[in-house]
């Protein structure tokens, strides 16, 4: 086990927020893999998934949305980069207007995109979830 893993307060749970306004979704371009995705990241030890989503959103974009304004829309298994399983929680937030993020080092660009008209490459898990939520209205 690496020292970073021993000192880490992160869990195998990832949590994120889908911010949408009218028919557009906020996406950020990740610097590590070049995929477009929503602000999301690892939940820390002794942190609930929704608290992790709020924290990650604030850290990555400087946008603060209270827990009470987030709705859980997806929960499921994910495959981590090392091939082992983890959990993924996704929340959505309907904004009255479009927030302007201030990005951290994890992202290099951002934009609001119409559902179905995404930049490429789009995070593969996210594409399916957006389809369920906004096109099929399952959630």
Task: Identify the function of each model-found stretch.
Residues 27, 88, 133:
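Flexible, surface-exposed loop/gating regions in the mature catalytic domains
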Residues 14-15, 33, 86, 108:
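A conserved catalytic-core signature of glycosyltransferases
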Residues 43-69, 74-129:
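Unchanged
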Residues 1-9, 138-139:
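Short, Lys/Arg-enriched, disordered terminal segments
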Residues 11, 36, 111:
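Residues that recognize and position ribonucleotide moieties
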Residues 127-139:
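Charged phosphate-binding loop/patch that engages nucleotide di/tri-phosphates or the phosphate backbone
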Residues 20-60:
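Conserved Nudix-box catalytic region and its N-terminal flanking loop in Nudix hydrolases
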Residues 5-25, 73-75:
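Conserved N-terminal beta-strand and adjoining loop/helix that marks the start
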């Amino acid at each position: 086990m690496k020292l970073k893993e021993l000192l880490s307060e992160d869990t195998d749970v990832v949590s994120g927020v889908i911010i949408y306004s009218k028919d557009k979704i906020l996406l950020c371009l990740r610097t590590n893999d070049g995929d477009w995705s929503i602000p999301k990241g690892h939940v820390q030890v002794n942190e609930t998934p929704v608290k992790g989503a709020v924290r990650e959103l604030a850290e990555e974009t400087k946008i603060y949305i209270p827990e009470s304004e987030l709705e859980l829309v997806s929960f499921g298994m994910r495959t981590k980069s090392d091939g082992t399983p983890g959990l993924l929680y996704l929340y959505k937030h309907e904004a009255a207007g479009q927030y302007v993020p201030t990005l951290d080092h994890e992202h290099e660009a951002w934009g609001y995109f119409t559902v179905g008209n995404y930049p490429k490459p789009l995070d593969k898990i996210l594409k399916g979830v957006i389809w369920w939520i906004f096109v099929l209205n399952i959630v």
